[in-house]
Amino acid sequence: MASFQTLPEAVAALVHDGDTLALEGFTHLIPFAAGHEIIRQRRRGLTLIRMTPDLIYDQMIGCGCARKLVFSWGGNPGVGSLYRLRDAVENGWPNALEIEEHSHAAMANAYAAGASGMPSAFFRGYRGVELPEVNPQIRFVECPFTGETLACVPAHRPDVAVIHAQRADRQGNVLLEGIVGVQKEAVLAARRSLVTVEEVVDDLGARSPNAVVLPSWTVSAIAVVPDGARPSYAHGYYARDNSFYVQWDEIARDRDRFTRWIEEHVLA
């Protein structure tokens, strides 16, 4: 059952050096505040999983939190590249980073398999592409019923899943709505989970048709962190700070400027 904790308490209890960690949220509800707390607590040796690693993983990688990244597509959405990710891969700064690249379909299916307690995911994909040549985790099997060739990847079973949501009720049930990515699957696949929320309410209230409610028993800890997804957006609460994404392109290009920004805005 979910317990209500402060963000520093929850990260200290749930996220350990060497863990496999998934911070999920698709275009919005990206758990920036939680990622910054992980940086402040100086976690090291993490394997980071994310469908679309963007600024928060760029920051965590640049701060030396990660040893490996499992992902599909990485970039600064609508702007360009992730220069801290590139520096780690190309130059080993601040440390070497192993990468394992998949398609979006593979990542989503791997989360779904993990959430179902399955060891691997089977799906139609990777036909006529070269990614399987550089990723040995992508295999192909023959369906025993149809003879069709299917792609196969290991299930994602992170030690910890971290997401941001709009609200939780006082019983620890969590509501997220708007564009829903793989947050539900990531939480269900993980051994432990942390949800940051904008607010706690008596009743979750009216919800949109595509809303997801995570029952309390699926969540390890809830931390109330208003604005916890900024500079991404939280549907119904605040808009995306597009100007910051543009600014990050310049900040992240230079190691010294990046380090100063982290010291001033995350570690201070």
Annotate each predicted stretch with a short phrase.
Residues 1-268:
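Conserved alpha/beta enzyme-core scaffold
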